[in-house]
Each structure stands twice: as structure tokens, then as C-alpha cells.
Amino acid sequence: MQALCPADHVYKVAVYPDAVELDSYTPEGEWSGYGYEAGGAVLSGYRITVEDGDAVLRFNTVEWLDADIKARTILIYDATTGYALNLTQLERVVGVYGGLFEYRMPDEGVARIG
């Protein structure tokens, strides 16, 4: 896993208000609003765990405080290379205006190799 997702890379989460299919980061169609910067938020808590024989990449929950955000697609990507690691399509558009927007990482991890 560390060969594919090195610990010294920068990882980010970007938000898109529409359903989009991506294999890398693009600013095209990305959310733009108060409290949200283009490119998204830098992820913290990089860790690789072993679960049922699989290597699993995990990060901490991401929070935007006092933000205006509308999301339908969440992209977790390697900002060093631009490549997508995980793309989540939400069932519906969710958002917050002038409040806390929190994204919890997928229970199965961001990436899994087994």
C-alpha cells in the first residue's frame, strides 16, 4: 500500500455539487463557496491498517467550519500526483450554509489492497 500511496504525499478531499465521474482531481465543476478553497481540504491522520489480510488506507474525518458547501460527489485524491483514490457519490445533494460540514471517511477505508 505504501508504494501506491506514500506517506510523504499530500492527500486532499474535494467536493462537487453534481454527480461526476473522475479518475483524477479537476477544478472543473468543483464547489465554490464561502469557507471552501479550490482543491479541497488537506487530509490528516494518514494510516495503513491490516484488516482480514487487506491493507487499508485511512484518514481522519474532515470538517469545514462556518462554511457554505453543497455536495453530491466527494473525491479523495493524492494532491502530489492528482490521482483519485476514492470517489463517493452521495444518494442526494447535501449541504450547509454558514455552518459545519463534516465528511467521515468510508468505513471500508479510502483504499484497500488484499
Predicted region positions:
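Small cysteine-rich, disulfide-bonded extracellular modules of the LU/uPAR three-finger superfamily
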Residues: 1-72, 79-114
